[in-house]
Amino acid sequence: MIEFVYPHTQLVAGVDEVGRGPLVGAVVTAAVILDPARPIVGLNDSKKLSEKRRLALYDEIKEKALSWSLGRAEPHEIDELNILHATMLAMQRAVAGLHIAPEYVLIDGNRCPALPVPSMAVVKGDSRVAEISAASIIAKVTRDAEMAALDGIFPQYGFAQHKGYPTAFHLAALAEHGATEHHRRSFAPVKRALGLAS
């Protein structure tokens, strides 16, 4: 793994996304600028934390961060642009939503969207960079809550459990009930359920 060197600037934003793989709902991104004077203990990749710990850190990040923002790309944008370009758009929206302009942006993964400030992609950044860990927590808690709300409207799909990922249960529900307006119609399992697969 390439050695990561933290940038020598004051205002560093971390950016991460949640929801590239699911068949339903938005891809949700977050951008976070942490306050060095108010450290947050226990930041890590959101997927490695218990739900209880994630929720506690979510509240602490929102309280202590200098700035945080959400960005999203909706299913119709994912279908129009493709998931990669929609994710980049959502990241741009998250950074643009920060009320303090960052001097540098660190992004989880291996590519950066076009941004008006210097940026760097950090592979496994959600485990290596506190700002990206914080962004991953904000994005995951937000998207999980959206999936729980969608589950209340469409209980037959099990969204609260699988968060929209293509589990056997979700695929069976798609086959039985068809797709909702929240499904990503460009994704192969949804296409098949709609009879659009070639």
Curated annotation (Swiss-Prot):
The keyword Plastid does not apply. It is found in: Cytoplasm. Keywords: Cytoplasm, Endonuclease, Hydrolase, Manganese, Metal-binding, Nuclease. Manganese or magnesium. Binds 1 divalent metal ion per monomer in the absence of substrate. May bind a second metal ion after substrate binding. Its EC number is 3.1.26.4. Its main location: cytoplasm. A divalent metal cation binds at residues 16-17, 108. InterPro entries: RNase_HII (IPR022898), RNase_HII/HIII (IPR001352), RNase_HII/HIII_dom (IPR024567), RNaseH-like_sf (IPR012337), RNaseH_sf (IPR036397). Pfam families: RNase_HII (PF01351). One of its GO terms (cellular component) is ribonuclease H2 complex. Belongs to the RNase HII family. Endonuclease that specifically degrades the RNA of RNA-DNA hybrids. This is Ribonuclease HII. It comes from Citrobacter koseri (strain ATCC BAA-895 / CDC 4225-83 / SGSC4696).
